[in-house]
């Protein structure tokens, strides 16, 4: 039997999205561009087609767009290692946990995370 995460272990927003990023698993693409400043999300989005804003909560702003045949998520991390830690953990949760059932997915998903900016490279 798969482990079931408690409310304290897996915090969700009232709409069922992940707590800080306010994203749902189906909104996440395999390639994620990470920028620090939320204003840079729109700047990166100018280089994509079919751009769709996804969420905007605190320092975490996101959109989804396309570069050729590749869907891409652009997401701001805010300032500092603490915020980056939240982003990386919540992206992993979106990719590998069924939020409705609060259980790990049967298969794992790897994401391609690319950091764009002046510092904070992973």
Where are these regions (language model features)?
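Metabolite-binding pocket within alpha/beta catalytic cores that recognizes anionic/polar moieties
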Residues: 2-122
């Amino acid at each position: 039997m798969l482990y079931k995460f408690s409310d304290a272990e897996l915090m969700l927003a009232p709409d069922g999205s992940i707590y800080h990023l306010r994203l749902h698993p189906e909104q996440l693409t395999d390639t994620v561009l990470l920028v620090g400043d939320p204003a840079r999300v729109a700047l990166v989005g100018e280089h994509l087609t079919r751009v769709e804003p996804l969420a905007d909560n605190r320092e975490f702003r996101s959109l989804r767009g396309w570069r050729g045949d590749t869907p891409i998520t652009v997401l701001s991390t805010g300032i500092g290692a603490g915020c980056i830690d939240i982003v990386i953990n919540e992206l992993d949760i979106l990719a590998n946990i069924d939020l409705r059932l609060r259980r790990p997915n049967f298969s794992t998903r790897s994401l391609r995370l690319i950091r764009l900016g002046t510092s904070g490279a992973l």
